Every structure is written in C-alpha cells, then in structure tokens.
Amino acid sequence: MIKFGEAVLGNEIKAIVNVALGKGELIENTFTNALTRGNCVFANLRPNLIVKPLTLVVPRHNIESEIQDELFQGVIQYAVAKAVADLDLDEDLKVVVSVNVPEVPITNLNKRKLFQYFYASAKLAINRALNEYPSKEKVKKEKYRALHPLVGFRDVRLEYPPYLQIALDVPTMENLEFLLQTIPNSDHIILEAGTPLIKKFGLEVIEIMREYFDGFIVADLKTLDTGRVEVRLAFEATANAVAISGVAPKSTIIKAIHECQKCGLISYLDMMNVSEPQKLYDSLKLKPDVVILHRGIDEETFGIKKEWKFKENCLLAIAGGVGVENVEELLKEYQILIVGRAITKSKDPGRVIRMFINKMGYDIDTYRLYFDEDEDIGEEL
C-alpha cells in the first residue's frame, strides 16, 4: 500500500512538497531507492533524534551551493520532521518527502518563512496522502477551471456552456486587431477565425489572434476535402477546434473528426445546406463534438425539430439571426450562439459583446472556493 500527497504554499518563497507513504514492499523499495541517491537525509528534530515513522527528505533537484545545502540540512528538513512528529502517525509507516530547495539569503526572517511554509506544506501533503485527496470528483470538477500559475491560461474544452462564438470575417488586419482589442475577458467567449479571414491571411492568422486572446479559437475551414491534412494544419496553428462542412463526402467528415480526436481538438460539423442533418449525424461512425445548425434549416420555429436528437450527444450551435433580444430563448435549446456582423459591424463591438455575455451567466471563478476551502481533512466534501 502506498499513497501520495502534494502541497504548495508560500508566495515569494514557495515550499513545494510531494509525499509518498505507506507500508509494504512497494514503499520499502521507494524508501531504499531514495536512500541510494546519497543526497537525502532522515528527518530529524536535532542531530541524533530522527522522527518516527522513519521519514526521508529528498531534494527535488541538485543542491548547487552552500546556502542551499545549509537550508536543506537545517530549516527545511527540520520543518518536515516537526510536521511528522506533530501528526503522531502510525510508526509502521515509511514516509518519503520530496522538497524544493530555494536559494535565498540566510536571514532570520527567511529561515522563519521557510520553516513556516515547509512545515505547513509537509503536514498538508501528508494529510492529503492519508485521505487520498483529491478525489476523482474533485479533479473532474476542477479540470476546466484550473489555472496553473506557470502557464497563465486554461485549456478550454467547452465544458462550461453557454458560449458566444464571435465569427471574425473582417476584410483587413486593421479591422481584426481593432476587434481583438475590444473583446472583454470572459469564460463564455469563443473566437472563430472565419473562412474568408483564413483564405485571405492563412491559418497563421490564428497565431496573430493568440497575441490578443488566449481562449478557445475555432478554425472555420468548412473542410470539404483532405480532412486529415486541414485539421493537422489548424492544430499546428494552435486552433482549439475545426469546423467541417456537412456537405463534404462522408469519408472526409469521418477522417477529419478522427484527426481532431488524435490531435486533441474539438470537431464542429456545419450543417449549412444539409437537407437532413439528423440522418447525416446518425450515419457517422464517429460523432462530432459540436453540430452547427442554421436558421434556414427550420425558419418557422427557429429551434430544434422534435425528431432531432443531437442534444443527447453533443453541443449544439446556432448561426443566423442571433441577436441580443433572443438570447434567453435560444439558450433553452443551444449551447453556442454564433454571431458575426451584429458584433463586427457595430460601432462599439465591445459593448455589444458585453450585452450578449451578460445574459450567459457567471464566469467560472465567480463562486469558486479559494485555497481549496472545500477540502476537509478526514472527510472530503
């Protein structure tokens, strides 16, 4: 039996702690392998007083200076030792603790900070290991909200609908850059590199869009042929999704969807000029992630026909005639609203965008619990 835990605390100085603990052959091997590294120490409260259960403290990286060596051998390992001693753990456990070793001037203040941060991180990481935190449900809940501090952007997979998809089909680079500068920060916005835009500037236009917007970008290629090649080109240009034309040969559609799956992209299937969207959808061996419907498919009701069953399996997008005045009604049936000229032709596109997204609910972090406040050691909520 072996369990794992992790914790990171601190601001200017960070304490990064990874823990493996348990009983039996697996942890014994881990313990022995750590000992063979030669740069680890037994966690001790003072020389000749190691803590129980036996705990090895291992640096995450090579120690390259006398300052790092003194901090590791001294205050960092002591903080880990004190955390283990205070937890009063089962003596039969074996504990391996991996720590980073910051290189900071040795001052009383820095030593106190290091002790405080590593003590708390070690204690938290051990408790997390014992309680098998986080749960699978926690990871599933956080995967689309997580924002790693060293990355700076989220990997959006359309898991938090509804979305406003802004179709950018402007004729000049000046127009494009103007629009990109007006887009407000929102988790409900998707940008579409429109077909005319891509034809004029190439898929490299997506890289230009990235300089202003690092959210979800759709390459509206309306793929009709060479599905795999076009998807791969969009992937290399950092698109998050590719739009495939529903009037393409079925083999092209399937190959394009398959390539999207291989590349980790979201596949859109555009049903423009498709007379029987449901029949086409049902006939596909591989299903798209998003189906785009157009107002012309059902002018009378402007909604999903009762016999259509897309909603059970994928996200639905609607294009054509989408306005601020009908957002609430459309969101009853569709998860993505595609808007082009109503925004791009506006004198104040930023204001129009905000009018749309203000009707789409809260952003991801609005009611987010900070510092993992839902974490209750001993009984995870």
UniProtKB/Swiss-Prot annotation:
Name its pathway.
Carbohydrate biosynthesis; D-ribose 5-phosphate biosynthesis
An example molecular function term from Gene Ontology annotations: hydro-lyase activity
Keywords of the record: Carbohydrate metabolism, Lyase, Multifunctional enzyme
What does the entry give for GO biological process?
A: 'de novo' pyrimidine nucleobase biosynthetic process; carbohydrate biosynthetic process; L-ascorbic acid catabolic process
Keyword Repressor in annotation: no
What is catalysed by this protein? 5,6,7,8-tetrahydromethanopterin + formaldehyde = 5,10-methylenetetrahydromethanopterin + H2O; D-ribulose 5-phosphate + formaldehyde = D-arabino-hex-3-ulose 6-phosphate
According to the record, the residues making up region (3-hexulose-6-phosphate synthase) are: 151-381
Region: Formaldehyde-activating enzyme; residue ranges are: 1-150
**Annotated family:** In the N-terminal section; belongs to the formaldehyde-activating enzyme family.
* The protein, known as: Bifunctional enzyme Fae/Hps
Organism source for this protein? Answer: Methanocaldococcus jannaschii (strain ATCC 43067 / DSM 2661 / JAL-1 / JCM 10045 / NBRC 100440)
